[in-house]
């Protein structure tokens, strides 16, 4: 992933994680933040186990994953896809990344009148409920509304 994509997805964005069942029924969960590894290959999304239970079940069966990132104030959006994902516990660096993501998102949505407390209530995770969803994206798409929506973006 290039520096622009990384800066965007690790910034103040809304994150939606999606997958599907064996019957092709969609599953969706909100991500609370993300972190890209030093090699720019792997992405870890931070989620609530309870809220993402169906997504986790689908991913555990080997279903593909799509993650959409969108900045509320500008509607800039992009989507990353991978044929499968792995589940993990959050590492110490993940917690600081989660805090940075939530703080940046709070600054963005404050322009729409939402408080930092609102963001912490919606996106906050506790250690027992938190889970990491790891993916190695092989496709990226521009999803910002307009003439370039759906365009492929370079992943590597």
Task: Show which residues each predicted segment covers.
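A generic local secondary-structure boundary/capping motif
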Residues: 4-6, 56, 120-125
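Extreme N-terminal tail/first-helix region
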Residues: 1-11
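A structural micro-motif recognizing beta-strand termini
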Residues: 48-50, 138
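C-terminal edge-of-domain segments
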Residues: 88-156
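Generic beta-strand structural signal
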Residues: 13-15, 63-67, 76-80, 129-133, ...
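Short, structured beta-strand-loop surface elements
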Residues: 51-101
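Short beta-strand segments
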Residues: 10-48, 78-79
